[in-house]
């Protein structure tokens, strides 16, 4: 990791720059602290962009391990910078570091300092993070935090995103050739004319239901988006009276650059920018204007998810909090209830019916046969936060010290939380405070979904469940518990894993064939008659515990029967240990050119 070099402390002058009047010690501390926080954020932001800017070089050099290392470093950067800034502030403020009256003045001065800056919301979130670390705030303290539930962060955006425009008057392939020429890399395209021709063909196919000619213009963001092994050009395609998103996916193969896919379906672009994907590395001059532009492509995508997928995970949490509590203020009579699905052995899971997320609290005691400790569960969630999620792991955001009105909880749920989650749930007057809570997008549990839909959709879901296991395995993730209840189906119909307490690396498992019974007593034994170690996995047993109908079982075995064999897993382990990196395309094969 590169050491963080935050800007040095601002000079603690005795005189006001405006009036040249002597400052009181408190005034000097306010100025010092507020400028120190601003400078600390700008130091963080510069470091964030420096890491992000490496993505182009990683792509050009096919340095996929380096790209993965950058992704982890950038995720960890925020907390490292906050810790460094907090230590500096504690030294600057000394005994007054816990003085809320002083912090209220720091808050006011900080607001003045950032008033004319772009991406003010990022500055504000950084400030809030620091005050919450100093005071362990339960809920929100408006005197020392920036709170504006009714104002969206994008309301103030006036800085348009930089983009390139292309008018289409005739030869569409020539326009795409110009597009590729406008986005050069240190390595050439293997066959740019062929790529342009294929793009023209595919866009004609995908927009065949538009009026002729379907394409009148293109508009692409200047910034290239990078993630894993691909680079993306993102923008809009215009017809006579409509527009659609357009994403051109580029790959760097051993033979050079080539176009891998063209995506104009809004649903597939939403998946690309979704909550099951790792974060993009896109060097944006300002983030808010990019979010505004992306919202024109994906109007139903929550703002918090767009900030998050752009790598601004802390801002994503801020926006999720803002939107959630604005929703609660509009629906004060609606109650939190148990989430649909089987009761969790490790987590208490609840939801608000009108809001598309679930809340997960770790139980004080886990039901048999779960044996792990609370710290192990938290570690699993941290692992997912840092790992490549390959579109199959839901992004679980950790919130601390959340405060809710006690009256908004259904009686049965309230009783369960107070009795079974005492380490996490505290009562404070008429409120409940959750010291540790994961919030995730709500999915329909797969076991329920299969009972509710027609056979064709059930078959598609169970086949995608098998594909999800393969995608995770190739990224070195073994779910641990393959039961259908631990997977959910997204609105796009994708199978997503969301129960992480038994998740582990594929390379940590010992995949074994089931021993053959040596005599009748062993064959008739009620339990396992053979020794089973903690990390032993028997793939042949998987289908026995899924509870599938004969039709669904047959469909799963036909499509993905190899995942129920020891040989497939052992071969995969060898590949992973040899350094093979999985490439899981974030779009269906039908969109590839």
Regions found by a protein language model. Give the residues of each.
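Conserved kinase catalytic-core helix
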Residues: 455-485
């Amino acid at each position: 990791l590169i050491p963080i070099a935050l800007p040095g402390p601002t000079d603690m002058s005795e005189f006001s720059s405006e009036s040249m009047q002597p400052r009181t010690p408190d005034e000097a501390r306010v100025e010092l602290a507020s400028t120190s926080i601003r400078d600390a954020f700008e130091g963080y932001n510069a470091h964030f962009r420096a890491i992000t800017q490496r993505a182009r070089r990683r792509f050009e050099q096919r340095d996929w391990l380096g790209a993965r290392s950058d992704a982890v470093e950038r995720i960890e950067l925020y907390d490292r910078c906050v810790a460094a800034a907090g230590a500096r502030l504690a030294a600057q403020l000394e005994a007054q570091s816990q003085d809320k009256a002083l912090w209220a003045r720091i808050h006011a001065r900080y607001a003045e300092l950032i008033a004319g800056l772009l991406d003010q919301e990022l500055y504000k979130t950084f400030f809030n993070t620091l005050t919450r670390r100093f005071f362990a705030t339960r809920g929100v303290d408006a005197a020392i935090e920036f709170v504006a539930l009714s104002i969206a962060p994008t309301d103030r955006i006036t800085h348009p995103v930089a983009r390139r425009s292309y008018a289409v008057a005739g030869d569409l392939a020539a326009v795409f050739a110009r597009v590729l020429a406008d986005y050069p890399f240190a390595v050439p395209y293997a066959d740019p004319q062929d790529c342009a021709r294929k793009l023209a063909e595919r866009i004609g196919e995908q927009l065949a239901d538009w009026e002729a000619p379907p394409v009148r213009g293109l508009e692409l963001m200047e910034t290239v988006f990078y993630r894993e092994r691909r680079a993306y050009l993102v923008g809009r395609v215009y017809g006579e009276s409509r527009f659609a998103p357009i994403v051109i996916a580029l790959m760097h193969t051993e033979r050079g650059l080539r176009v891998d896919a063209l995506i104009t379906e809004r649903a597939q672009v939403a998946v690309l920018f979704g909550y099951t994907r790792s974060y993009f590395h896109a060097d944006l001059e300002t983030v808010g204007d990019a979010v505004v532009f992306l919202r024109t492509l994906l109007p139903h995508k929550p703002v918090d998810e767009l900030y998050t997928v752009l790598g601004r995970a802390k801002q994503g949490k801020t926006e999720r909090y803002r939107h959630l509590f604005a929703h609660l203020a509009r629906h004060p009579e609606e109650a939190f209830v148990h989430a649909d699905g089987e009761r969790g052995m490790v987590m208490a899971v609840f939801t608000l019916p009108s809001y598309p997320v679930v809340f997960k609290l770790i139980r004080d005691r886990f039901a048999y046969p779960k044996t792990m400790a609370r710290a192990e569960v938290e570690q699993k969630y941290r692992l997912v936060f840092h790992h490549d999620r390959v579109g199959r792991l839901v992004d679980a955001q950790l919130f601390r010290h959340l405060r809710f009105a006690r009256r908004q909880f259904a009686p049965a749920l309230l009783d369960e939380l107070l009795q079974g989650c005492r380490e996490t749930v505290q009562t404070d007057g008429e409120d409940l405070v959750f010291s540790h809570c994961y919030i995730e997008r709500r999915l329909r549990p797969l076991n329920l979904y299969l009972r509710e839909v027609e056979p064709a959709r059930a078959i598609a879901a169970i086949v995608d469940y098998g594909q999800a296991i393969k995608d995770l395995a190739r990224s070195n993730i073994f779910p641990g518990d393959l039961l259908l209840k631990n997977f959910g189906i997204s609105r796009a119909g994708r199978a997503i894993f969301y129960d992480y307490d038994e998740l582990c690396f594929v390379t940590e498992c010992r995949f074994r064939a089931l021993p053959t019974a040596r005599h009748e007593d062993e064959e008739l034994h009620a339990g396992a008659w053979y020794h089973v170690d903690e990390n032993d996995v028997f793939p042949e047993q998987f289908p026995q515990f899924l509870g599938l109908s004969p039709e669904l079982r047959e469909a799963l075995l036909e499509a993905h029967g190899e995942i129920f064999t020891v040989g497939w897993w052992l071969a995969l382990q060898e590949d992973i240990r040899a350094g093979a990196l999985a490439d899981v395309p974030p779009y269906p094969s039908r969109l590839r050119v």
